[in-house]
């Protein structure tokens, strides 16, 4: 078969990398900013603002993964069985992944964790996108205010719920 007729077998690479284990999720839950609505909770940790604290022989795994793999952001999806059966859970995960792909520029340098609730299944893609953008912009605004406060000497605060 001629080379020009062969289909390209490689897929384009994803701009994100996924959170893999409990310790990575826990770091985002504990150190990140959180925002809740009736459909899902969003936890965001800004990895680009704070430099990784390195001890001897230890590197911060989240910050290193952004630099090493050339990923723009890290994504974690925590969809409980309470949300619905496997078909519903997978639909929600596909929608959330495509949302972050669509708005990858907004997510750059962040570690995001979505925790959908059972009402999330009944939202269509555009309503889900609207809620996601509202929550992400409010968290980013709050993070910028907190960063300015840290420069003035305030302590770290979390986003209000």
UniProtKB/Swiss-Prot annotation:
Q: What keywords does the record list, in alphabetical order?
A: Endonuclease, Hydrolase, Nuclease, RNA-binding, tRNA processing
Q: What class of enzyme is it?
A: hydrolase
The entry's family comment says: Belongs to the RnpA family.
Q: What protein am I looking at?
A: Ribonuclease P protein component
Family annotation (InterPro entries): Ribosomal_Su5_D2-typ_SF, Ribsml_uS5_D2-typ_fold_subgr, RNase_P, RNase_P_CS
Q: Does the keyword Ligase apply?
A: no
Q: Name one GO cellular component term.
A: ribonuclease P complex
Q: Which GO terms describe its biological process?
A: tRNA 5'-leader removal
The organism named in the record is Helicobacter pylori (strain P12)
Protein function = RNaseP catalyzes the removal of the 5'-leader sequence from pre-tRNA to produce the mature 5'-terminus. It can also cleave other RNA substrates such as 4.5S RNA. The protein component plays an auxiliary but essential role in vivo by binding to the 5'-leader sequence and broadening the substrate specificity of the ribozyme.
Segment Disordered: which positions? 1-20
Catalysed conversion reaction: Endonucleolytic cleavage of RNA, removing 5'-extranucleotides from tRNA precursor
Give the lineage. Answer: Bacteria, Pseudomonadati, Campylobacterota, Epsilonproteobacteria, Campylobacterales
> Subunit details for this protein?
Consists of a catalytic RNA component (M1 or rnpB) and a protein subunit.
């Amino acid at each position: 078969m001629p080379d020009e007729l062969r289909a390209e077998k490689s897929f384009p690479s994803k701009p994100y990398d996924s959170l893999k284990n409990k310790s990575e999720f826990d770091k985002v839950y504990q150190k990140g900013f959180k925002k809740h609505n009736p459909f899902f909770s969003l936890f965001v940790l800004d990895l680009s603002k704070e430099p990784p604290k390195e001890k001897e022989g230890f590197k911060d795994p989240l910050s290193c993964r952004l630099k090493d793999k050339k990923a723009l952001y890290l994504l974690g999806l925590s969809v409980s069985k309470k949300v619905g059966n496997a078909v519903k859970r997978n639909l929600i995960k596909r929608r959330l992944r495509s949302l972050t792909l669509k708005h990858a520029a907004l997510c750059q340098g962040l570690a995001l964790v979505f925790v959908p609730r059972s009402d999330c299944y009944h939202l269509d893609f555009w309503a889900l996108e609207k809620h996601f953008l509202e929550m992400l912009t409010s968290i980013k605004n709050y993070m910028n205010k907190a960063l300015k406060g840290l420069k003035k000497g305030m302590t770290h605060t979390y986003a209000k719920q």
